[in-house]
Structure formats: structure tokens, C-alpha cells
Amino acid sequence: MLIYQDVLTGDEMISDAFPIKEIGDIAYEVDCANIIIKEGDVDIGGNPSAEEAAEALEEGAQQVNNVVHSFRLQSTSFDKKSYLTYLKGYMKAIKSKLQESNPDRVAAFEKGAQDFAKKIVANFKDYEFYIGESMNPDGMVCLLNYREDGVTPYFTMWKDGLKEIKI
């Protein structure tokens, strides 16, 4: 099993237990689902059926995103200006990390990140924002959006902001 950690904070952000698709060698899209948890339930990474979401919530139960719940991601908020300020600093930090660990990747990262950031800004209103469990403001901000059906959630995460840990 692979766990993906934020390279800046060490927070666990995702694992390969969730479907992960690489987007343009710059980001990952991670499919997720809204699940119902009850007080005392233990989530072992199973993927509940889609019909379960339609059931009424029992007392003490709540509907949560399985990635947010499994990795204890914390909701945060941005307006466009503050997100762009954050993103500029984050990209600089990731570039610095890449220069230490993988200097050959820097040029591709800069080009890909610039293009991908334009897509994010163009669809800014569609995103919800999450940060790692430590709530470190310097870490990665994961972007939650919904597929064209308006129901299926997915996260977008910067590929170079994650490191694989084999467990």
C-alpha cells in the first residue's frame, strides 16, 4: 500500500486505496465518495454502495467525504485573491524542494503548474478547500470538486507536493 504525504508538512493526504488518476504530469485526481458514519463505526477503507447515500441518516450518524474522514483533512476557505497569494508561496516552496531532490523536474513543474493554475482560477467558484490534519498553512491545499454529474466528488492534489511512502 502507498500513502502519499505532503512534502512540506508530512501530513498524510491520500493512499492508493482510492482511485488515483494522474492529470498532465502535474496533478492527481482522487475519486472519493460521501459515506455515512455512525458513532463508534470504524472505517476500514471499504467502498460503500452508491445507494447507501440515499438512505435517511440515523440518529448519531453523519454524512462525510471518505477521503476527508480517513485522512482527517480540515476544511478551509479562500477568496480568489488569497488563494492566488497562497499558491504563489506554495509553488515557490515546492520548486525549492524539487531543486534539492529532483532538479531535472523543475522546468516541467514550472510549466505544468502555471498551466494548471490557470484552470483552477478559471473554475475557482467550483472548489472546496481542504488542508492536512496538522492545519499547517504552508502545506498543500487540496481542491474538492464534483464530476459533471454534480454528485460524484473528487480531489485534485499537486503531484510534486506529495511523496510516496510504501507501507
Curated annotation (Swiss-Prot):
One Pfam short name: TCTP
Keyword Chaperone assigned: no
Domain of life according to the entry: Eukaryota
GO biological process, one term: translation
Cellular-component GO terms for this entry: cytoplasm; microtubule
Gene3D superfamilies: Metal Binding Protein, Guanine Nucleotide Exchange Factor, Chain A
Record's keyword terms, sorted: Cytoplasm, Cytoskeleton, Microtubule, Protein biosynthesis
Main location: cytoplasm
Record-level Gene Ontology MF annotations: calcium ion binding
Residue ranges of every copy of the TCTP domain listed in the record: 1-167
Cellular compartments annotated: Cytoplasm, Cytoskeleton
Recorded family membership: Belongs to the TCTP family.
Job description of the protein: Involved in protein synthesis. Involved in microtubule stabilization.
Protein name, entry field: Translationally-controlled tumor protein homolog
Record organism: Cryptococcus neoformans var. neoformans serotype D (strain JEC21 / ATCC MYA-565)
Lineage: Eukaryota, Fungi, Dikarya, Basidiomycota, Agaricomycotina
